[in-house]
Amino acid sequence: MEELVGLLRIRVKRGINLAQRDTLSSDPFVVITMGSQKLKTRVVENNCNPEWNEELTLALRHPDEPVNLIVYDKDTFTSHDKMGDAKIDIKPFLEVHKMGLQELPDGTEIKRVVPNRENCLAEASSIVSNNGKIVQNMILLLRNVECGEVEIQLEWIDIPGSRGL
């Protein structure tokens, strides 16, 4: 069995202007996958601007493994409708974490990541110091859908005794 590097906590905050998949609205939920790990939020019924505010934690063994986010519309009698997807680019976040800058004053911006073809950012994203931790807030532009964004926050959790990053 491969050794854990650490834990990646993803706070799935909210959806913004998600696509309508049912008659009047949608019943969205988020699925995050990394390798064989698959985590999901609760369903928010009848809402194209849902507030999840849920923490999903992935065990990281391979820092280069892609992290994917997919939004679905829950359907009771048929398969769930896909409402878009995004790749979460964690590389800049992990690079900053390796610098060991957790002791900076709260709110200090360490790095700014701009949208490009390699990430799904809707706007520039800041990696900042927050209560002795490094966090990154992002708004992801969903792909393969007519509209929609998802706001998330990344946070790294060290595991005592692990090899770390």
Curated annotation (Swiss-Prot):
UniProt xrefs under PANTHER family: PROTEIN C2-DOMAIN ABA-RELATED 4, PROTEIN C2-DOMAIN ABA-RELATED 6-RELATED
Protein name per Swiss-Prot or TrEMBL: Protein C2-DOMAIN ABA-RELATED 7
Modified residues (N-acetylmethionine): M1
Cited PROSITE patterns: C2 (PS50004)
SMART domains given in the database record: C2
Protein role: Stimulates the GTPase/ATPase activities of Obg-like ATPases. Mediates the transient calcium-dependent interaction of PYR/PYL/RCAR abscisic acid (ABA) receptors with the plasma membrane and thus regulates ABA sensitivity.
GO terms assigned for molecular function: GTPase activator activity; metal ion binding; phospholipid binding
Native organism taxonomy: Eukaryota, Viridiplantae, Streptophyta, Embryophyta, Tracheophyta
Pfam families: C2
Subunit structure comment from the entry: Binds to PYR/PYL/RCAR abscisic acid intracellular receptors in an ABA-independent manner, both at the plasma membrane and in the nucleus.
Main location: membrane
Protein family according to the UniProt entry: Belongs to the plant CAR protein family.
Gene: CAR7
Alphabetized SUPFAM superfamilies for the sequence: C2 domain (Calcium/lipid-binding domain, CaLB) (SSF49562)
Keywords attached to this entry: Abscisic acid signaling pathway, Acetylation, Calcium, Cell membrane, GTPase activation, Lipid-binding, Membrane, Metal-binding, Nucleus
